[in-house]
């Protein structure tokens, strides 16, 4: 994958938490060679207490969700104004810093808490590494997103285009 992203000419961003500043940093991976892309992706998924921070250029980085769990900023900064935000829980992001952007926000159903058709509650979503439960969540997210979008996506874009 890294060779597909490196030098592709299309922006492809990853968000990492800078441990020195406590702020999010956004890396346009299309501007980096494949080995640096691996470092960036490793850093962007370094969940504290699960994976170690990744050092890049003398700075330690962690999971970007620590400082920006809905990384709209890099896309907004390059001119995008229409976003589909798919949340992993019921907590929404503060999108007020993007006043001229349009958002279609998607939230998962409570079914996301059930595991393997056994009717039992799953462990905390991010830290549940059970492959079966991950597959269940992926399929549930795909199904619910397609169901929602089939009835709303056309309206979302039509309404905005008419303004």
Q: Which residues does each PLM region occupy?
A:
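Patatin-like phospholipase
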Residues: 1-163
């Amino acid at each position: 994958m890294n060779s597909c992203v490196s030098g592709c000419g299309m922006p492809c961003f990853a968000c990492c938490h800078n441990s020195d500043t406590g702020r999010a940093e956004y890396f346009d991976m299309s501007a980096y060679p494949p080995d640096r892309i691996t470092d960036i992706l490793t850093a962007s998924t370094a969940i504290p207490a699960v994976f170690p921070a990744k050092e890049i250029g003398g700075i330690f980085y962690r999971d970007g969700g620590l400082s920006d769990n809905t990384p709209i900023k890099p896309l907004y900064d390059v001119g995008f104004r229409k976003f589909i935000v798919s949340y992993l829980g019921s907590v929404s992001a503060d999108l007020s810093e993007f006043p001229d952007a349009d958002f279609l926000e998607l939230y998962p159903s409570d079914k996301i808490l059930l595991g393997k058709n056994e009717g039992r509650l799953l462990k905390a979503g991010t830290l549940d590494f059970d492959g079966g439960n991950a597959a269940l969540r992926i399929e549930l997210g795909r199904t619910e997103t397609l169901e929602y979008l089939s009835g709303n996506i056309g309206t979302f874009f039509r309404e905005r285009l008419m303004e």
